[in-house]
Design a protein with these regions (language model features):
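Bacterial signal peptide processing site
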Residues: 21-23
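Chitinase-like catalytic core of GlcNAc-active glycosidases
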Residues: 27-39, 67-190
Length: 295
């Protein structure tokens, strides 16, 4: 009888240690830091934005370099809306070139697309004297239709980055948590654009806890290291000649953050806000940003 009890205790301890090991392996190599997205077409920071970087100890800026969209005759992907660099980031703040790719670009393979993107990023860094880059991020709302081609494309990106030892990351939407993890070093979980824009009178399309809730149970078992990105922006649009403004209340952001970190505590390690802009900075109180960036 005593032997049976000891065996049960041993099994329970093994399960506990296995669970801890899994949690540790999810987060291996993920730096604890505060970051922002920069999503404008000219890298130029005003005094409020520079003060924000300093006040909240921002270490990384995920900077959109350009989009990749299908060309006019829908035959080949091509770059669009390339950023200009009128300013530089403060010393000690790392820039992460980020490329947004429309999902239709991944409906079929495109020869040399990965090489063209890597070469273009490296050339932009060289032309604009941007040094000490260590990573590229790819942003794509891939679906079950485009996933296979997208993952192969990411493998090709990794191949072309390997000689310069860059890391590769990608964005992860909530609906993508049910798919196999992409072949990257880590993902950024986009905790925004969670709702149906057509149902804006019922729920906030930027972020609503009710839209996040169904995905909470998938967080802990997702194998890829994850940073999290929260919305601080406003979405203004015209619906039937009526100006509609979508803004997420601070309480809703923090409610979602708390629920996600309850399921996977390590999501507090690397926090990003989307996106840095003076209006967005002034939209929320300093204590709200302190809570968003709390580790």
């Amino acid at each position: 009888m005593r032997g049976e009890r000891l065996a049960i205790v041993f099994c329970l301890l093994t399960l506990l240690l296995t669970g801890c090991k899994k949690q540790h392996s999810q987060d291996a190599g993920l730096e604890q830091c505060n970051s922002v997205y920069f999503w404008r077409t000219d890298l130029k920071l005003d005094s409020t934005e520079k003060a924000f970087l300093s006040q909240y100890h921002i270490k990384k800026v995920y900077c959109r370099y350009f989009d990749v969209v299908m060309n006019d005759d829908a035959t080949e992907p091509s770059p669009n809306a390339t950023i200009s660099f009128s300013d530089t980031l403060p010393t000690g703040v790392e820039i992460i070139p980020t490329i947004y790719i429309t999902e239709d670009c991944m409906h079929k393979p495109h020869k040399n697309l990965a090489k063209k993107i890597v070469d273009r990023v490296l050339q932009m860094n060289k032309t604009n004297d941007i040094n000490h880059v260590q990573e590229i991020q790819i942003d794509c709302d891939y679906t079950s239709r485009s996933r296979k081609n997208y993952y192969q494309f990411l493998e090709e990106i990794r191949h072309h980055l390997s000689p310069i030892t860059y890391q590769l990351s990608t964005t992860i939407r909530l609906h993508q948590l049910s798919m196999p993890a992409p072949p990257v070093d880590y993902g950024v979980l986009m905790v925004y654009n969670t709702g149906d824009p057509r149902k804006w009178q019922e729920r906030n399309p930027i972020l609503d806890y009710r839209d996040v809730y169904p995905y909470l149970s998938q967080l802990d078992k997702y194998p890829l290291p994850l940073a999290t990105a929260y919305p601080v922006y406003q979405w203004i649009r015209n619906i039937q000649n009526v100006r509609v403004e979508h803004t997420v209340e601070a309480e809703e952001i923090l409610k979602v953050k708390k629920a996600m970190e309850k399921e996977r505590p390590s999501l507090s390690r690397s926090i990003i806000t989307y996106h840095i802009e003076t209006d967005n900075i002034n939209r929320y109180k300093p204590e709200t940003y302190e809570e968003i960036y709390r580790h």
